[in-house]
Amino acid sequence: MGVPALFRLLSRKFAKVITPVIEAPTEKLPDGTEIEPDLSLPNPNGVECDNLYLDMNGIVHPCSHPEDRPAPETEDEMMVAVFEYTDRILAMVRPRQLLFIAIDGVAPRAKMNQQRSRRFRSSREAALKEEELQAFIEEAKQQGIPIDENATKKKSWDSNCITPGTPFMDTLAKSLRYYIINKLNSDPCWRNVRFILSDASVPGEGEHKIMEFIRSQRVKPEYDPNTHHVVYGLDADLIMLGLATHEPHFRVLREDVFFQQGSTKKTKEERLGIKRLDDVSETNKVPVKKPFIWLNVSILREYLEVELYVPNLPFPFDLERAIDDWVFFIFFVGNDFLPHLPSLDIRDGAVERLTEIWRASLPHMGGYLTLDGSVNLARAEVILSAVGNQEDDIFKRLKQQEDRRNENYRRRQQRESNQESESYVDNVVIQRSVETQSTEVVTSSKSTSVDTKPPKKTQKIDAPAPVDLVNLSEKTSNRSLGATNRELINNRAANRLGLSREAAAVSSVNKLAASALKAQLVSNETLQNVPLEDSIASSSAYEDTDSIESSTPVVHPIDTKVSNVGQKRKAPDSTEENENTDTVRLYEPGYRERYYEQKFHISPDEPEKIREAVKHYVHGLCWVLLYYYQGCPSWTWYYPYHYAPFAADFKDLASIDVKFELNQPFKPYEQLLGVLPAASKNNLPEKLQTLMTDENSEIIDFYPENFTIDLNGKKFEWQGVALLPFIDENRLLNAVSKIYPQLTEEESKRNEDGSTLLFISEHHPMFSELVKQLYSKKRQGKPLKLSGKMAHGLFGKVNTNDSVIPNVSVQCPIDVTSADALQKYGSIDDNQSISLVFEVPKSHFVHKSMLLRGVKMPNRVLTPEDINQVRAERSFSSRRNNGNSYRGGHQSYGVRRSYQSQSYSSRQSYTGVTNGFANGGVQPPWSGNGNFPRSNASYNSRGGHEGYGGRSRGGGYSNGPPAGNHYSSNRGKGYGYQRESYNNNNRNGYY
């Protein structure tokens, strides 16, 4: 998920980072046969890719519940959809060296809190959706509308099964193994490409498995620094992870989530599966493929070079260190592991505010905030203190902005009140002739809520039995008084759409009746094909789509003229009862005491408890940064609160001793029990299900049927905080250990840690040597280290894996029915590939945040006009924040200053404001304006000339005082830094 709305922010602020993907067209022969493009030809996007990495969860989710077509009815159909989706990505990217497929395995405990919240919300939404469907069926029956009972009884697919340890994930792993083998055997384009599969049995989040692999390759002396990487995924944090690699040839591939094909709002008929007989286009309707886009990290680096540059520093400016700092302070705005600081909202310009504070503070901090994933807490306190000084003003301004939005909304509501009150029923005007008993239907041209697609001229058709809309609404209103769930549905709808509860109920009933009437007008036949998933609108109604899992689906029980439900915040109607009163009132004096009392249950006379929350949050910041830059520092650490402290309370941070114990990840079943609600119990073995449902279970309190969602000042439920109890690890492990002996062999196997697999075709240059060495009698099962010419640029250890060997038959693990699928995914009679157990090499040294020697930087893309635009926005941001209580006021680029180049140990010079290595430096294309005249001085890539120590005896990361950060491992490994120092005479930086 990452930082909510980050992708949208970057695509708007730095427009050129986004470019469309060019896909080679499929050639069609006269007989209708389609010929796929030749993928061995140069990539039409103009850039060749060496390594492609697939964050597979970003493929499974859109394939399991697509937006542009009916959802697959079986898991086998889902697997075929996954194959086809992956084929499309391969055709776009055309990797020449490696394809790395990573599926989310067991996540660190810090991530499980977010996963638990998301899955409980999903279960709650499904229950409300089912309740609403039953209400619709009841209303339809009262109107005499026959409903297909088989369709209404269809069980919805539980997306919570996309979690390690479930039978679905086991099927996915088997299917992908077959997919890879099939590719290597049937498609000559991929015979020289190596495939690596890290499935859900291998612990770790998919994107972090990918980053661990990239880091492991970078540290090898033989690694090619000009390797071109592409990562596919929908999580916004892939952008930050891409920056954290310091690989300039790096792109992120993703669907264009903002692409809209026509109207984004489905009609009632479409959502309920009602087919119009007069709409012949429906049968020929072909879904339009959603386009893909590149996010170019190299161009983002260009933008950040301008955005983050600070003149007149007492130490040399280092772009790599500045980027690391930028990645770090964006964590304050929110991430998957910590709640965002109360005063920092990305939609309120928090990123720009933090950037401005950082630029103003950097000259006075003595150095950068971070070093290779470790935080200097004393300097971090400078930034947080500056934010804290602004908190009062921020909260007041947010309240003023909200009041203005509400007032503007009320004015619009007043102007449109007549049209709004008529709502959906005005779309259809019925005139019934007493003499002819026929009806004339006229469709209003003003309607925007429903696409009725009327005939070209008015028609007369036989009238159905009359429908009493008024009586229906009265009956429903009376009946809903005692229906708790139904009332909840209407209340939720009213809260989202800015309607009163009464208006929502009446509107829902009126439109239900109108929809039923229209269906009768079209046909008196039985309504068919009303699946549970499509019966009531369900969409990802969130403000910014940064991840396929970034929000909970929101049920829409009523139709309205508001088409962008959940995308644009709506002010409440003046008549609405405010059920979610903001009792904290951050904009009024005394908010600090109210906030801690209500959110943390801490009274004003307990400052030590606030300090404890601050310590936990600081640990969280250090944990997240290490996770991004070095790998998981602790599998068991987590932030034990639902909310973050105020920035003003982050004081004396240098005295906080930050240490982590690595420990071990959960087993898959332990994670399932930690994140799934009881409604998803079927994803677990039957013996373990009792822990979630038996009232005598020792952990039954982990699975509440009802829980509170605190809107926390927001408008929509998905923005709120799910107040679920935190899992007690010891109680969970103790309970599950008693049941493990009762599991079957197959069930126990799904709970075991698996291995990463490497697949190679017989035609690959390294195949023969690998087989010769691995299967020799001398080897006797020992792993083989890939190095030298045999490695062909891939480093790690491999060992035999007898599950896939050459010259044997391989069966497709899924049942395919379509002729096309049968042709593509049949049995492989004579396998010509091999799979090996692959071990990602473990480094005993800290991964350095630096460009590698010998890298050739991409050509610059930004023009002087682009750079001036960034400058102008910086200047505007500075003026807007001028006068706030942090040092520096506002800055501009209009200062003539010598910008020093960087000198690496190779004696090559990297010109500071350019992104290119060259002997003697490369003059930046926009330096002619005099702002950045080049200097002949050179300095070390580390910017602050820090010294780097070797292994620490204590086994830990350490910046030394004042930060005092440590990283320790119960496995006895650890690495340390010496204290940061600035030394004008030190040019190499390493000693």
From Swiss-Prot:
Subcellular localization: Nucleus
Compositional bias ranges of the Gly residues kind: 946-958
Family named by the database record: Belongs to the 5'-3' exonuclease family. XRN2/RAT1 subfamily.
Keywords: Exonuclease, Hydrolase, mRNA processing, Nuclease, Nucleus, rRNA processing, Transcription, Transcription regulation, Transcription termination
CDD domains documented for this protein: PIN_XRN1-2-like
Keyword check for Nuclease: yes
Bias kind Basic and acidic residues: ranges: 404-418
Keyword presence, Zinc-finger: no
Protein name as it appears in the record: 5'-3' exoribonuclease 2
Region (Disordered), start-end ranges: 404-461, 547-582, 872-991
Subunit field text: Interacts with din1/rai1; the interaction is direct, stabilizes dhp1 protein structure and may stimulate its exoribonuclease activity. The interaction also stimulates din1 pyrophosphohydrolase activity, probably by recruiting it to mRNA substrates.
Molecular functions (GO terms): 5'-3' RNA exonuclease activity; RNA binding
GO process terms (BP): cleavage in ITS2 between 5.8S rRNA and LSU-rRNA of tricistronic rRNA transcript (SSU-rRNA, 5.8S rRNA, LSU-rRNA); DNA-templated transcription termination; mRNA processing; nuclear mRNA surveillance; nuclear-transcribed mRNA catabolic process; positive regulation of chromosome segregation; rapid tRNA decay
Gene: dhp1
Biased composition (Low complexity): 433-452, 878-889, 896-910
GO cellular component: Las1 complex; nucleus
Enzyme Commission code(s) on record: 3.1.13.-
EC category name: hydrolase
Composition-biased stretches (Polar residues): 926-938, 980-991
Originating organism: Schizosaccharomyces pombe (strain 972 / ATCC 24843) (Fission yeast)
Transmembrane segments: none
Function: Possesses 5'->3' exoribonuclease activity. Required for the processing of nuclear mRNA and rRNA precursors. May promote the termination of transcription by RNA polymerase II. Essential for vegetative cell growth and chromosome segregation.
Motif (Nuclear localization signal): 264-268
Any single Pfam family the record assigns to this protein: XRN_N
